Structure formats: structure tokens, C-alpha cells
Amino acid sequence: MTTQEFNIALTHEAISEALADREAIVWRDRRLTYGDLTDRSRRLATYLHRAGFGVRRERADLAPHESGQDHVALYLYNGNEYLEGMLGAFKARCVSVNVNYRYVADELRYLLQNSESKAIIYHSKFAPLLAEIRDDLPEITLWLQVADDSGEPLLPGAVDYEEALASVPADLPDVGHSPDDLYMIYTGGTTGMPKGVLWRQHDIFMSAMGGRTPGVWDPVTSYDEVVDRAVNGMGGVMLMIPPLMHGAAQWSAFILMHQGAKLLIPDENRRMDPASVLRALEREKASTMTVTGNAVMRPLLDEMKTEKYDLSSLTIIGNGSAIMTEELKAEVLDFLPNTLINDSVGASETGAQGSHLSVKGATSTGRFGTGPGLVVLDVFMEKLHEPGHEEPGWMAQSGWVPLGYLNDPEKSARTFPVIDGQRYAVPGDRARLLESGEMELLGRDSVSINTGGEKVFVEEVEKAVASHPAVRDVTVAGRPHERWGNEVVAVVEFVEGASATEAELAAHVGKALAPYKVPKGWVMVDRIQRSPSGKADYRWAKKLAAEAAEAAGGAG
């Protein structure tokens, strides 16, 4: 590993000094240069610093699961303010906290309390919900409200975000920025309560924010090299579709900035609107676009096929966090034959781990080339699997990995075990290490289904169901069964104007999977519920499956 360690605030400062006039963010009528972003993030940092926020205890005085910095919650839709919020927090030696803007009051209260947030930056649209729970959040003493088109007035005691920035100089606070400063990302809470994953900034920079050369994996060795890569790199324009409140989107955005490229945000930032996405792509000639599986790519492709848009600039579609089936990839690449699809694998607890490229005529899903430190541990977490080992194990990552979960030493010890002197991150994904050295990702153990003593990975079933031409989207969950313990249930959304019977769907899946993996229950819905980033909502699917059984007189 490199001996030079990095701080994200300082990497941004160094790049911005060299690229002050280059555009960094484009959203609606806003066109911010790297210099503009530096000015605004410095002002936010100064405002936070003058308000008394920053570092309380240095890393050397803390346990791995502890934070010694003040936390700033970002309760925002995509926009320039989100990245300003992250950078401003880092430059004040605070820690940004990602807040899911779909949360209801109880979920929002839990996250803001659990994260120990001391300040919050939020869009005006969210002011009424915050007002409901504000009395339960006495630790939050600074409320910065970002104006939007909702017409909601300032909360009592809140400060308008733009007025706050205008009230202070654009100075970088002299606070002793350190590679030990924290980056924190809250997990989605898809299968349990959200948890704050703590990373050293140097480690997340190396793991997932552009500190290494993709494919080659060589780490940068100096700030001068970081600047040189940004000045002389590929540049380009990346269209950001997933919400920046999710880790993968944040990592993509920071990789982009560390390449000196431009981040493009669709005009419609509250939902995925295919027309808004493609209008932005055409207008700014975006070269890269990020998506999250079939749920995002299918409606985009349908809109592309109206042939209203010039898509000739698009060369790479980056996919992560959800499955894009081989069938849909082939359809996309038939329509866009000069485009590549890059699947990435990783988790909040591991950073970026591997990738796979699909091109016209050669598509696959679920297998990835492995990066340094990516291994498979046996089921007892005692030894490593060799390539070609038939049994699945735990996908694990060594090297640059997180410190732990905020204020949870027990969970931290389970997820980040030390084996033969090496520390690993083991977030719960099952995988096989193939003879070729590729990784075959099977799925998240926490949402697997045990039916009749056999383990079924829902992602494998979802992939098979989604390959049916009538299926637009699918989520698979388990529900109690008197005989088998649990049975596999598929919640299905059809393509508009298409349909299939349960028997037809089961027969289709049975061609690809063993009988015990074929769904025994089917629930047809108008729309699959997903997170804003496109991730499956397994709690919703499980509840729906159980309700369907009750309505039918009980499962089994």
C-alpha cells in the first residue's frame, strides 16, 4: 500500500486549484465550476466551524466504532447542495450523514438520533415532517434549510442555506485535516435497522472514490499525482440517476471529481423520469450514465426506443446495487451497439470490489472480475476458499476496509473479523470463487429463504423470473409454510400490455432452476416498490406475500 495517506477535503482543494474554471456540476440552469464548488463548500465549512462544529476527539483516542467528530445530516434530493454538504462537512472536519428522503417520521427520528447528528441541511419540502419530530431531536442545534419549489416557510430558528453561505468568507478553516477524518455511510436498512458504517477518509478514497486505477488497481502516491490525473484524465460527463443519499452514487460522484469530470443531474430530481434523464443526456452529451438494475434500465430503454433523443455520446452504462438481466443487457446493446455495460459489485462495508463488462454479443450477469483483497471465506469464517471450490462461502474483503459500525462494537466484531492476523469485511453475501478467478455472486444471506432444508438465494430466483419477456420487475421473498417451513414467493410487475399465468411463469423459471427454487406463490402488482436508488424492498415484499396467503385462506 502507498505510504502517502489522503484526506478527501484536501484532494478536492488540490484538484479545484488546478481546475478552477472547469465545470463540475450541471443541474437545471445551474452550472458550477470546480472553483464555484470550492467557494461554496468552503463557506459552508466556515459557517459550521464558526457555529462550533468540528472534531472533538482525535482518532488515536477512540475505539474503532466511535466517532470523535460532529455529524451533519443531509436530508436532500440530488442537487449541488448535496455535494456541497459533504465537502463542506469534510472541510470543517465534520462527518456527513446520508438521510433517506422516503423515510416516514419514525424512521427519520431513529436515523437522526442513532447517527447523533448535531446539524441538518434539508430541503424545504421536508420541513413539515421535521417539524413533527423536532422536539425529539434536541441534539440538533443547527438547521439549514435549502429553498425549493414547495413554498414551505423556514422552520422557526432555521437559517436559509444561501443566506448562511453569503454571511461568511470563502476561507478554508485551519482545522488540521487528517486521513483519519471519517466518512460515514448509513446502510439502507432493507432487512434491518440502518447502521452507520465508519470509514477513514484515506481508506474510502482508496477503496471506492478513485484512489486507484480501475483494472490495474495501482494506488496514487501523492496529491500531485491526484491533480495530474484530474487535469490530464479522460474527463467527460457522467449522468447521475441514483440518489446521492446512497453510497454507490456518492462513490461515483467522487470518482468523477477525482477525474476532473462533470457531474450531470437530471432536471427532475425527486423521481426517476426517463424523459428528463434522456433530455439531459442529449443536451450535455453525457458519456457515462449510472443505473440500478432492470427497475431503472427498462423504463429508460422504453423511452430510448421512441427515438426522440440523440444518444450518440453515450459510451458506458454503469450498473450497480441491483440486477440487470442478461436478456435486458442484450436488448440495450442491440439498441446501443457502441455502448458498454459495466456491472460493479460492492457494499457499504466493503467499498468497490469488482466489475464485469458486457458488450454486444457477449453479456453475462452475476460474475465479476475480482479486485485486490476480494476473497471467499468458508462458512465457518476460518479459512480461504481456493479457486474452483464447489461450495459457496462468504464474500469478504481485506485491505482498505471500514473501522466498524457507529456505536456498535458487537456487530462490528461480527462483520469485520480478524482471521490469521488479517482483518476482513464480511457484509453477508454468499459467493463462489470460480476456477477462472472470477467471483460468482449468489446473494445476501440475510434475505435468503430456507425451504425444506434447502437455502434459496432470492437474487437467483429474481434473475430467472425477470428473464420472462412479460415481466417488467420482480422481488422474491419467503413466507411461512406448514410443511416446508418457508416457501418461495415472487411479487411480479408485468410489462404494460403483457401478462402470463402462474403456470407459465413457473415453467419458465423451472427451465433455469431446480424445482425447490421455483416460486410456489405468485403475487401480481401494478408496481414493485423499491428504494429511490432501485434497491429491492424485501420487507414490503415479505409483508405482501404473507397478506396474499391470508387473503387466500393461509399458505400451505
Language model segments and positions:
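Conserved AMP-binding A3 loop
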Residues: 33-35, 182-218
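Conserved pre-ATP/AMP-binding loop-to-beta segment of ANL
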Residues: 167-186, 192-193, 198, 228-238
